[in-house]
Amino acid sequence: LRAGRREGRALFDYRRADFPFAMRTVARLRAAVDEAQHGRGVALVKGLPRDALTADEFELLTWAIGLHLGVARPQDRQTRYINAVKDVGVDYRSPTGRGYSSRAELDFHADSGDIVMLTCYNQAPAGGDSLVSSGVTAWRALASERPDLAHALQTRPVPFSRQGEQGEGEAQFTQVTVFARTDTDVFCAWNRNRIVNGMKLEGAPPVDDAQREGVE
């Protein structure tokens, strides 16, 4: 990592070739991606060299790992690609709240990237636990127990609030179905906080009883 690091160099100026990880490290990362995409849906990689790195170096390590996994996508209107999970007093339930800037217990939700990476530099004094659930399992349970609600959430879009991060000329919300399917895969676009906030926005299309019950 330090061999590839250049003082003052922006993250976007780095390339995968700047960080020639050992083959065993690359294999471990690729196995984690495969597990996340085609296995349990989540993978835990331990042993990152936190004690040997400064906070800036650890951020660069996170970026370097990402370069070996895919193409980074922005997380917010400010086009930040790496965000610190830190309580800065944000109200998670507000129309513009983001969970990573609050101390709230977050709802289960599915982020929009193909792979989401969370690295830990500082252990939280209290809390900070992560829970993982399966959108595929949720779909199977809903389709088995309430096929009417599963059908509603698969075929009729619900409003998703943009949490105040819409671009100029864009609506405050977008519309997506909670579930989508192909012949082999199930996709889940679940974020209850954004859906509930989206339902309250002016101009948002009304949802029917089945959609509302499915969300609840």
What are these model-derived regions, one by one?
Residues 62-72:
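A short alpha->loop->secondary-structure connector
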